[in-house]
């Protein structure tokens, strides 16, 4: 995978303002996860594309790219958790949007500052409704409920 650094676009370090909506950031990250799953070599063109398509600044898109890379680094671990929670379905049979919504949500749960589980589930459902099909919402909610209530999995059980 090609690497993209902020220096490629500007000489200043990246900082994100508190005013940037977290919902919008999740949408951009989800789009990046999807795009990089479809074409891993497309990273260099992803930043300008998302800047034009989402009307978001370069700084925020680069922050999203950094978060996306962090999720991809943990994807094997996250995929294992998702796969273990599936009862009558294989991980490979999941739609790509569903996989990436689950990865994003679980990454936020296990590797980010604490966020209420109900908020994470609501955000996952919102993303599925926006980027996939609403019929998948109960399935996503059930998977996340199973994972969040599994006592063997908690924020401290994964390697950070």
Swiss-Prot record:
Keywords: RNA-binding, Transcription, Transcription antitermination, Transcription regulation
Xref: InterPro entries: NusB-like_sf, NusB_fam, NusB_RsmB_TIM44
Keyword Cell membrane: no
Gene Ontology molecular function: RNA binding
GO biological process terms held by the UniProt record: DNA-templated transcription termination; transcription antitermination
SUPFAM superfamilies for this protein: NusB-like
A Pfam family: NusB
UniProt feature coiled coil, ranges: none
Family: Belongs to the NusB family.
Name this polypeptide is given: Transcription antitermination protein NusB
